[in-house]
Regions:
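Bacterial N-terminal signal peptides that target proteins for export
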Residues: 1-5
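Intrinsically disordered/low-complexity terminal segments and short unstructured peptides
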Residues: 10, 26, 210-217, 302
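Bacterial Sec-dependent N-terminal signal peptides
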Residues: 10-33
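Glycine-centered flexibility sites
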Residues: 19-20, 60, 166, 219
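C-terminus-biased signal that marks the final domain/tail of proteins
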Residues: 26-152, 249-432
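Internal mixed beta-strand/loop scaffold within catalytic domains of large alpha/beta enzymes
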Residues: 140-244, 397, 406-408
Length: 432
């Protein structure tokens, strides 16, 4: 009897002293509940739940486990994508890995833990094009915007009297190299990070945890656009601007919060870029110009009033009130002129203005989406000819910051027919 009592007491002690798995003692449920990965047809809905006290490593680890179990051919697709970025040469492959290793040192600790958790599911050996994703390759994948540049984008917003709702409406186009086999198109993703009042969503790709496009539960929207100036690439001591943008949006209550964070002179980035910002009342463009030629190269915010003060560089005009646009160029007076000399920028800017004027004095959501879908050929066109919907379009988004209404068009994973003649937007529910 004494032995039976001791056994029962010991059993109760062991059962009572163990947590629910992954979250430590006292967690209400296993870490399995920290992450969901749901196939929505042409994109994956990812939910990373920090509301129950799971650590970044635990969330990342569960995310990686579920991706490998849920997303067919994930490793082979992304490994081959990285090989194509490196032009299948070991020289570029090693160069990109070394760049990523340097930038990785300057990531916020929370994001490093999350990435390391995901990578805990991967192999450690680096081998170009082996069909497996290694730890270092996964970090490289997440730092592609900082390491290997091959993108183009545009964005447009209207508000006030120019918007039929009186509130901000915007469209954003992401034009990325999707891979010769549409590798990225297979892993389109909308990732929702649930973290109390600091919850936010990111539109991008499965496993990529920097912010290309995103918004928080307070209606602050941000999106990145490249703006190369021809200046020498430098990565020593640099940070990742997509991960810094994630942190800024996560903590922001206003557009100024994001802009001030991202233009902090203490933070060095590999390349010049733009941040398209919007809330329910207006939209801005942060011109993060820190290298290049110009009479006043600087990191400044452009608003709807900037055309008159301080003005635009010679040869650039917009002239449409209560609206703002961005392509892959700086336009503020004194910043590097990578606009008038590059047809893809000047022509797309002109198309945005022309199509917006054709929409009339008050713009509906349907009309704004039509502007974003413009092509002179009636099918995916050429950026250099001013086509906004081009053969490189990867994602098209329509968003209302006031209501958090999101609609999206995602490039198809079909190599034979990745894009229809006209994009069709679908509602994308986001719940915080």
């Amino acid at each position: 009897m004494w032995l039976l009592g001791l056994f029962c007491g010991l059993s109760l002690f062991l059962l009572g002293g163990c947590g629910g798995g992954g979250g430590g003692g006292g967690t209400p449920y296993p870490v399995d509940r920290a992450v969901s990965v749901t196939n929505k047809g042409n994109y994956y809905e990812i939910v990373l739940n920090y509301n129950e006290g799971f650590s970044p490593f635990e969330v990342g680890q569960e995310y990686g486990r579920k991706v490998l179990a849920t997303v067919p051919g994930y490793e082979s697709a992304l490994d081959s994508y990285l090989a194509e970025l490196a032009e299948k040469t070991d020289f570029l492959y090693q160069l990109f890995l070394s760049r990523a290793e340097e930038i990785r040192k300057n990531l916020d600790a929370t994001y490093v833990e999350e990435l390391e958790g995901f990578a805990d599911n991967l192999i450690t050996e680096n081998k170009l094009g082996d069909g497996r994703l290694s730890v270092d390759e996964f970090f490289l994948l997440n730092l592609v915007p900082d390491v290997a540049r091959a993108t183009a984008c545009n964005a447009l917003a209207v508000w006030g009297n120019r918007s039929v709702t009186g509130k901000t409406q915007l469209v954003r186009s992401l034009e990325w190299f999707s891979g010769s086999q549409e590798q990225l198109s297979r892993v389109n993703a909308v990732t929702v990070v649930k973290n109390g009042t600091r919850s936010y969503a990111m539109v991008g790709y499965v496993g990529m945890l920097g912010m290309l496009t995103g918004f928080n539960s307070r209606g602050v929207f941000a999106a990145v656009l490249d703006s190369q100036t021809g200046s020498e690439y430098s990565y020593t001591g640099c940070r990742s601007y997509t991960f810094d943008l994630r942190r800024a949006v996560e903590n922001a209550a206003t557009l100024s919060d994001v802009a001030d964070d991202m233009r902090n002179p203490q933070r060095n980035y590999t390349v010049n870029h733009l941040i398209f910002l919007a809330d329910g009342r207006e939209a801005w463009v942060l011109e993060n110009n820190f290298r290049g030629l110009g009479t006043n190269v600087s990191r400044r915010v452009r608003t709807a009033n900037s055309e008159t003060n301080p003005g635009f560089n010679p040869g650039i005009a917009w002239g449409i009130d209560e609206s703002i646009a961005a392509v892959n160029s700086f336009v503020l007076l004194g910043n590097t002129d990578n606009h008038t000399i590059l047809p893809a920028n000047a022509m797309r800017w002109s198309s945005l203005a022309t199509q917006l004027r054709l929409a009339g004095e008050q713009v509906t959501g349907t009309e704004l989406k039509s502007v974003a879908s413009y092509s002179s050929t009636g099918k995916p066109g050429n950026r250099d000819q001013g086509d906004l919907y081009s053969t490189h379009t990867a994602q098209l988004l329509y968003f209302c910051p006031e209501t958090l209404e999101l609609e999206a068009f995602f490039r198809n994973p079909s190599v034979a027919a990745p894009l229809p003649d006209k994009p069709t937007f679908q509602a994308v529910p986001v719940t915080f």
